[in-house]
């Protein structure tokens, strides 16, 4: 047995291969759907499995399992009205919410399927005579936690209706957010960081001003942001995983965005410097400083821009001249994202791009006396786990070159979790094995003359 272990270590040390993903910022066509309505919603499970929901008068649901080469119409028996949100878990399971079938709403519903639409099971309904659901989402970092929210069932100014799950959607519990006078919620604005922080945008239809509405303690208290954005339908709200930095997009043509650095208490006006008109949605990539803004303008052009510094600087991306973009979602596989976007005309575009992990968090202020690589936790894991390491005092009072790399059993490099100059301290980084099969993997820390290797087990 010892000789076998020694042989595996020899393979690992001397058979390291470098794997470079060829990613592109070019968006390409991934399908066309004719009957999904003006307000479609999209949920990306992985690079191949994507669900889309919408409809004009009745519910419409589609799914692809081959990256958009083919889209299959999912049965909607039991879904009475057009849909206002979708969150998919895999190729068979998904959750949807509805508009309640009238302009004023009332008794809106949430459903789930576990057999690709052969049956839809009612989870809950709002009751009341007003409002409808405005979206349903699960956390990217803690996918067992999800939220859906509805306008106040008793009318504007009354409490908002929420449902929450902490077990992946098996069970849902009712919650609420205090009513704000003469307001209701906005489509496409729901964001979910984790069980503590989530929120959405609200609008006053009389003044057409919108504000953020955010909780940081799991719904016990809600923050009503100080921004007043004139015009409104569709102003989007996104946050970084740090829970402090967030962006709000606007419905205008003057490049305006709003930014917070204190978790939504205060918002300041800024600009992208690039011309996007119409409703501008946003998508913040979890664990990074990368943010996308996309436009539903009816004119063709490059309707997506990208920032890699949390919204300070922006570059335009080629989008195959696809107008009317309504919602974007993605699946992240460490330093690569596969992103899909759906338009109001039923066009779907997708892109595979690289991102930089900003999840290297310094934990504690003490300077370690030794280099150390800790066992990942949890272990076994599925699909996320955290890896801690310590860097001893710097040489010559400078930072050290630190690399933390994950390999497979044959020594093939899978992803660089860290490749940075770091000061002495204790650090933590998160690894996502969502695109990998079950098995044993190695992670290797190197800093100056120090090298340490540990193994971890992914079980799906």
Predicted features along the sequence, with ranges:
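An edge-strand/N-cap motif at the start of beta-rich repeat modules
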Residues: 23-44
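Short glycine/acidic-enriched loop and turn motifs that connect beta-strands
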Residues: 56-58, 100-104, 152-156, 204-207, ...
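C-terminal outer-membrane/trafficking sorting elements
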Residues: 364-377, 381-460
């Amino acid at each position: 047995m010892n000789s076998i272990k020694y042989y595996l270590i020899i393979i690992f040390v001397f058979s390291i291969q470098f794997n470079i993903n060829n990613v592109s910022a070019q968006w390409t066509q991934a399908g066309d759907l004719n009957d999904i309505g003006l307000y479609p919603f999209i949920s990306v499970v992985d690079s191949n499995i994507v669900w889309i929901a919408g409809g004009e008068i009745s519910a419409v649901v589609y799914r692809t399992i081959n990256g958009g080469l083919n889209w299959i119409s999912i049965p909607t028996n039991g879904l009475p009205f057009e849909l206002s949100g979708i969150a998919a878990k895999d190729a068979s399971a998904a959750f949807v919410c509805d508009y309640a079938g009238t302009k004023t709403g009332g008794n809106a519903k949430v459903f789930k399927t576990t057999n690709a639409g052969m049956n839809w099971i009612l989870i809950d309904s709002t009751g009341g005579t007003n409002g409808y659901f405005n979206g349903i989402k699960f956390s990217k970092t803690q996918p067992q936690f999800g939220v859906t929210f509805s306008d106040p069932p008793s009318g504007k100014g009354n409490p908002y209706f929420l449902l929450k799950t902490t077990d992946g959607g098996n069970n849902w519990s009712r919650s609420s957010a205090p009513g704000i006078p003469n307001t209701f919620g906005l489509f496409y604005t729901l964001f979910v960081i984790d069980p503590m922080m989530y929120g959405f945008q609200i609008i006053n239809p009389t003044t057409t001003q919108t504000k953020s509405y955010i909780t940081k303690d799991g719904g016990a208290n809600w923050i009503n942001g100080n921004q007043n954005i004139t015009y409104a339908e569709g102003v989007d709200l996104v946050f970084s995983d740090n829970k402090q930095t967030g962006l709000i997009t606007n419905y205008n043509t003057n490049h305006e965005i709003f930014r917070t650095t204190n978790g939504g208490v205060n918002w300041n006006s800024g600009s992208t410097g690039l011309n996007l008109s119409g409703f501008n949605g946003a998508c913040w990539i979890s664990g990074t400083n990368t943010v996308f803004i996309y436009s539903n303008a009816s004119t063709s052009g490059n309707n997506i821009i990208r920032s890699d510094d949390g919204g300070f600087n922006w570059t335009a991306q080629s989008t195959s001249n696809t107008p009317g973009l309504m919602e974007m979602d993605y699946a992240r596989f460490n330093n690569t994202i596969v992103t899909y976007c759906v338009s109001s005309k039923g066009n779907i575009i997708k892109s595979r791009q690289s991102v930089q992990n900003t999840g290297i968090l310094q934990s504690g202020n003490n300077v370690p006396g030794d280099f150390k690589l800790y066992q990942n936790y949890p272990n076994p894991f599925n699909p996320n786990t955290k890896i801690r390491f310590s860097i001893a005092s710097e040489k010559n009072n400078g930072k050290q070159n630190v690399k933390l790399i994950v390999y497979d059993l044959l020594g093939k490099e899978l992803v660089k979790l860290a490749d940075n100059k770091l000061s002495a301290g204790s650090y933590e980084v998160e690894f996502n094995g969502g695109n990998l099969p079950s098995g044993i993997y190695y992670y290797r820390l190197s800093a100056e003359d120090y090298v340490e290797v540990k193994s971890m087990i992914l079980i799906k």
